[in-house]
Structures are given as C-alpha cells and as structure tokens.
C-alpha cells in the first residue's frame, strides 16, 4: 500500500520541494508535555528520561530490569518513535521500597534527567501534548512558496491523518488486520492484537478524512457533524447554530471523524452518509472491530499546530518547532510542506 492509499490527498496543494528528515536522531526531537504537578511523595517514582534511537517499550524493559521490577510496574503515557531523540516520563510502582539504583539502565542511548516521587502512577494518554523540534536537511524548495505554505498551515492547520508509522512497512499492519478480519479472528498475542486493531481503526479514519479533504470540508463544520475542542474527548452534534460557532475559525473547535467500534454512528446528515459509505466498503474490517469490543470514539479532523516557528540555520536546512496534541503526528505537518526523501547521514547539530 502506498502513501496516498494509507493517508489521502494533501489539503494545501503539492509539496513546495523536498528534504531529508531523520538523517540522525537529533533531527527529530520530541518532548512530552505533561500538566501534572508531582507531590514529591508516594509509592510511585516518576522519571524524566531522554532516549536516543530507542523506542518506549525498549526503554521500559531496561528500566524494569535495572530496578528489579516486573515490566507491569513500569508505566508511561505514550509511545515515542525509535528513530528520534525523545524526552518522556515513566513511573515505577515501588510500594514500601526505596528508590532503586538505575545506573544499569543508563548509557549513551538512555539518560534519567530527573526523578521525583508521586502518589499516583502515570496513566496511558495522560500527556496533554508533544513538543517537536525537527530539522529537515538537503532542502531543495521554492523558498517563497515554502514561506507562504508555512504561514498558511500555521493559520489553518493540517488534516489530522494518522501517520505512516501507524501502519507498518508498506501498510503491512493493515494487510494483516484484513487477513484476521476475513477469518473474524483476533490475534492471541496482546501486543499484536493491539497494534492491528489500532492500525485498522486508523486506516478507516484516514479514509473518511481523505474524502473530507477531497471535498474541501475537512476544516468546516457541517450539520450532522460531531464537534470537539482540541484535546477534549467529549463531542456534541452540530446543528445550524453550531456550524457558525466562532471557535471553529480560531482552531479551538473542530469537526471529528470516527474511530470505529460498537454501536451506531452518532453523526447525522451528509456526514453520517459519508462515514457509513466508508464502513460499508470496509465490511469485514468494521465487523472485526466491533467483535473486538472496541468502543466508538471520535478524533478531530483538523490538526491545529501550536506555536509554529521556523528558521534556516543553513541554506539547505529548515528547522521547525511546534506543539501538537497527544496522539497526533509531526510527519503529517511536514507532508503539507515537502516531500521526504530517504535519509543519508549528517553531522550538523540541532540547535534552535
């Protein structure tokens, strides 16, 4: 499966040029934003961890091993990319225990920058946002067009597609999900089951969003839409009055798309017809998600880009900094600017 099949059309026109992303881990930096004041006491030890070339699950295993704890005693808010320099929180459940010596977990690819006690464990999805610093190298672009495009996406946002990372190499996770759906079976292994169910829901969401982008309605409220605020998991039905809400224009309020699960579609009008059409075409995949007891959820169609800034440290390097809500993909922001080409290696340090 190619990129267009897995995501959909761009909203702001063809790419303004091309560049390389992730020539080194420092080219893709992620800082988790967590709005939780720590108490300084309690049976949970929270760790602020920097890791390079290491995914979240691998880091959790390292920390658990060094602490002499079962893996289930280590918690984190969200998964971060392996091919990146990331900083995120972990928590260790240590009832009645002293802080462990975690030196064995640390090395060139993992450093514990801060630790503090708290009275609660870190829950999945607890982070409010992620801050990104991206360096795009080997830049070949129309600079004037790129500047205009950057201004435009800062003002209008971009389609909130799930990124290619969600689907595996050449969409392999979607292919596997369809195979299981055809047999109406669920993978026995928990991690595989979670990955394939997530890929299936993400793919169907992207299909709906792709049609809204093609129709020019991805950033507009329609009667029958379900609307949600940035960062909120609650939503409400749009009537004529709601479609004129001024908070839509300032990117606080957005139309949403389906994360499929059990129950009827809660949308109405043309929105429900479009979403039902995607469900009908997917057939077995939707039935499979229902069989897996997935609950129907919603995700905003439009991705607002917080605090977008940029500069050119070298003529052929574009450096971006911005903040996205949790669960959103920096690569879909870049996709509205540039085509990405395979990475070589670069020694240029990332300094914003």
Swiss-Prot record:
Catalyzed chemical reaction(s): uridine(13) in tRNA = pseudouridine(13) in tRNA
UniProt-listed NCBIfam families: PRK00984.1-2
Signal peptide: none
Residues covered by the TRUD domain: 157-303
Pfam families tied to this protein: TruD
Gene Ontology cellular-component annotations: cytosol
Provenance organism: Ectopseudomonas mendocina (strain ymp) (Pseudomonas mendocina)
The protein's name: tRNA pseudouridine synthase D
Annotated family: Belongs to the pseudouridine synthase TruD family.
Function: Responsible for synthesis of pseudouridine from uracil-13 in transfer RNAs.
UniProt EC number: 5.4.99.27
UniProt xrefs under SUPFAM superfamilies: Pseudouridine synthase
GO terms under biological process: tRNA pseudouridine synthesis
GO-annotated molecular function: RNA binding; tRNA pseudouridine(13) synthase activity
This protein's UniProt keywords: Isomerase, tRNA processing
Catalytic residues (UniProt): 81 (nucleophile)
Enzyme class: isomerase
HAMAP family named among the record's database cross-references: TruD (MF_01082)
